[in-house]
């Protein structure tokens, strides 16, 4: 009898933020065990609510959002995004250069499917948000990982990036602010990346979903604004800044010499048309969300929840013998380093699985972010201080006598 297996296209695709360790956590929960999930940046379950005017706007427009929209998105949303690009100093963006999406995730899949032929190479950061590597692979390409240097605040290593460019390289991916490290790249680093793209005729994909979540007075700069002569696809959305991850509301913007990308843009239009349109009720809140008071800023100042939780987890992690971490400047993740020799760790997935089973706290291992060594893991610091303290205490207790057994 015939059996049905997954496509071979998926053989090398993984997304361990929601992978085998999460499956085990879900099994534990189904058996009645309470698990604290610190594996995914989903603000709402931790008590972060969307601004009231955003919710009211969706309710008000819902009756008028029952049909399809233009495949690029509704006019009001794209107009607001165009104005946001002006604030970000991204030049010459017209309405037709903007595409709304069901979150940035859908758009990552779209931009890679539209560009990549079998064997093409895309430079992707290590560590990365793993959907980038997964989508490049699914499209038939090869994700070539350049190192982000922990000793330099997790900034990209430009020379490593340069050394990995070949005649098969088509694009550079940057994630700024970065997930999982929380790094925010300064102008100088972005200008060096732009110079590489310019020198080797590469396009740039810039994932900027956390650009409104910076702390400590750190300014975010869009690489598209610094390199108007380089073809860039800049991605953003409301999931994190407005705490509406479940609404699936993202967008991408094309900038730079678009006449050099006519064929690619034709492909993007085809893919956009094939999915008809993105979520219309979510599109309807973009104008209010971007034009209104940015209430997320209150969370990011001293005394605000995200700021204080970042301060706590940074100190707590660095106080645990065998752990160290660079202080994140944005988003809500920290990416600690663990002394693998001290704990005899050879398999970071087993480490987080052991911790989950013993302490009922779910983390994500570093290799899930395409980090090459088993010496890092990611903590989401969205829970309140009481929950974070409990998680940090459990981690300290667990590591006090942990020795990995394979």
Residue ranges and their predicted role:
Residues 55, 225-304, 314-315, 399-400:
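Conserved core segment of the aminotransferase class I/II
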Residues 162-163, 344-350, 354-363, 369-406:
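PLP-dependent enzyme catalytic core of the Aspartate aminotransferase-like
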Residues 2-103, 110, 277, 289-292, ...:
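N-terminal small-domain helix-loop-helix segment of the aminotransferase-like
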Residues 31, 139, 199-200, 230, ...:
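Helix C-cap/helix->beta junction micro-motif
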Residues 144, 149-220:
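Active-site phosphate-binding strand-loop segment of PLP-dependent enzymes
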Residues 114-136:
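Conserved PLP-anchoring active-site segment centered on the Schiff-base-forming lysine
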Residues 287, 303-317, 325-339, 373:
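Conserved glycine-rich beta-strand-loop-beta hairpin in the small C-terminal domain of fold type I
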């Amino acid at each position: 009898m015939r059996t049905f297996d997954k496509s071979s296209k998926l053989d090398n695709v993984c997304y361990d933020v929601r992978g085998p360790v999460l499956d085990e956590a879900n099994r534990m929960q189904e058996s009645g065990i309470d698990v604290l999930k610190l594996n995914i940046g989903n603000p709402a379950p931790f008590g972060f609510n969307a601004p009231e005017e955003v919710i009211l706007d969706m309710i008000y427009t819902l009756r008028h959002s029952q049909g399809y929209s233009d495949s690029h998105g509704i006019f009001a949303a794209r107009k607001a995004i165009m104005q946001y690009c002006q604030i970000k100093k991204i030049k010459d963006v017209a309405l037709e250069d903007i595409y709304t999406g069901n979150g940035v995730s859908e758009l990552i899949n779209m931009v890679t499917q539209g560009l990549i032929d079998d064997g093409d190479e895309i430079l992707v950061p290590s560590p990365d948000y793993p959907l980038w590597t997964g989508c490049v692979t699914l499209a038939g390409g090869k994700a070539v990982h350049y190192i982000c240097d922990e000793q330099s605040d997790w900034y990209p290593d430009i020379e490593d990036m340069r050394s990995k460019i070949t005649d098969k390289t088509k694009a550079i991916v940057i994630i700024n602010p970065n997930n999982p490290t929380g790094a925010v790249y300064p102008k100088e680093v972005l200008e060096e990346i732009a110079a590489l793209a310019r020198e080797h005729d590469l396009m740039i994909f810039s994932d900027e979903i956390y650009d409104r979540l910076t702390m400590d007075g750190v300014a975010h700069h869009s690489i598209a604004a610094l390199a108007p002569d380089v073809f860039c696809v800049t991605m953003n959305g409301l999931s994190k800044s407005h705490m509406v991850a479940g609404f699936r509301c993202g967008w991408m913007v094309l900038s730079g010499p678009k006449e050099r990308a006519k064929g690619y843009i034709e492909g993007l239009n085809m893919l956009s048309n094939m999915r008809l349109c993105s979520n219309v009720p979510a599109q309807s809140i973009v104008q209010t969300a971007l034009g209104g008071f940015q209430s997320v800023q209150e969370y990011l100042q001293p005394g605000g929840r995200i700021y204080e939780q970042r301060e706590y987890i940074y100190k707590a992690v660095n106080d645990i013998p065998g752990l160290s971490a660079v202080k994140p400047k944005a988003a809500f993740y920290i990416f600690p380093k663990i002394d693998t020799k001290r704990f005899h760790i050879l398999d970071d997935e087993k480490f987080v699985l052991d911790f989950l089973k013993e302490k009922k706290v779910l983390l994500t291992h570093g290799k899930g972010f395409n980090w090459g060594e088993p010496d890092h893991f990611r903590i989401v610091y969205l829970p309140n201080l009481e929950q974070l303290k409990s998680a940090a205490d459990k981690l300290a207790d667990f590591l006090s006598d942990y020795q990995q057994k394979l």
